[in-house]
Amino acid sequence: MNRKMVFYMIGKIVQAEAAMLLLPLVVALLYKETPLPFLITIGIALVLGIALSLIFKPKDRVIYAKEGFVIVAFAWIALSLIGCIPFVLSGALPNFFDAFFETVSGFTTTGASVMTDVESMPHGVLMWRSFTHWVGGMGVLVFIMAIIPSVTDRSIHILRAEMPGPIVGKLVPRAKQTARILYLIYVFLTATEVIFLVCGKMPLFDALVHSFGTAGTGGFGIKADSIGSYSTYCQVVITIFMLLFGVNFNLYFLALLRNFRSLFKSQELWCYLGIFGVATALITANIYNLYHSLGKALQLSTFQVASILTTTGFSTADFDLWPDLSRSILFLLMFVGGCAGSTAGGLKVSRVMLLFKLIRRELRHMLHPRSVGVVKLEGKRVDNATLNGVSAYFPIYFAFIAGIFLILSLEPNFNIESNLSATVSCFNNIGPGLGLVGPVQSYTGYSNLSKFVLSMAMLLGRLEIFPLWFALSPSTWSKK
């Protein structure tokens, strides 16, 4: 373990967070709000970051798999601990556990909130809250790789540790170039959404906040009814961009190269769109009698399916009041998530596809014991290492969900439905759940212990368990 490289990178990341805090600082100044919470946090981040990068300056700057996992895990914890300081100092969330929960929810792009009166919060705080979505969406380590010259091109392990999904690789031979391409696509899509929303007469501040939330598939809103008070045009724009940010970013690179044949042959993309279409059709038919308008039912179901499938978490209606069939479909969509290599959370469409292909192979093998089954995805044979990883991930995934659910069951004021949906929603980085944590509710009623457990659930889900597991494992730090 190259410990110096680990802490050196943490120092650089903390310094980068100081730079990120300049945006909410400027917003606070523009709206004539006190800048002190951000100035103090920037000072703390700079001192800590510079100290770490100077004390632990490494001779060998190569990052291997072990270092990659540890850097990613510790970086996200450090970002959240420092990022919660403005919430505490501003008085928006004076309780540390509330502030930590909100910050983790932001960086992990979950969107679960403990704020009860979001419309009364300072603009600077709201901007920081949503900007954490944008930073966490593509991954702050990917951002660091894109801008810091000292990070070597053998750092693909950071990409693999931080980018969601079972298969992550390079778009181009150099990892640094891959990171830059990803962020250029990310910035372009975000800016495009801002322009479209402003054209729909959404105020610039609102457009920025909601574009950050859409891009990171996070879902923090600045209105009590989330997106419900905005025009139909703005809701449609956000629906489209939620779906776009749930697509594998490799496909956008193929589009830039005009390789449309490979783009439209993507099995994961068609499966993703198929799930969206089927779920939308079923929910539209199910809620039609509530609104007595096919157009209204289609608009609401389209938005909510896109929001839950991509794990964004915005809402235009209280879907917890919908019939049980619609609520059940949305609950199941919480597990699926978007495509691998997107900013969405959840299991990922490709991983679900591989699971069903593995099940089909085993069933065939039971009928034909001598057969040799080959699992293919996107027309290519999937190697055994990837298949083993998928097979191992599912039982671990459900074991963590079961454990977190049992801990939440100790809460006296929450029922099984609320606790289960809170667990699934936080672990899959969605935000709203059902019952007492539904789209018009918040997580503020949970105890400090439960909020901390749910914060860890969000981190585990965003990093897909293994980086945090490895970072806290004693064997990772042993010299053997």
Predicted segments, located by residue:
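Membrane-proximal intracellular helices of multi-pass ion channels
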Residues: 1-480
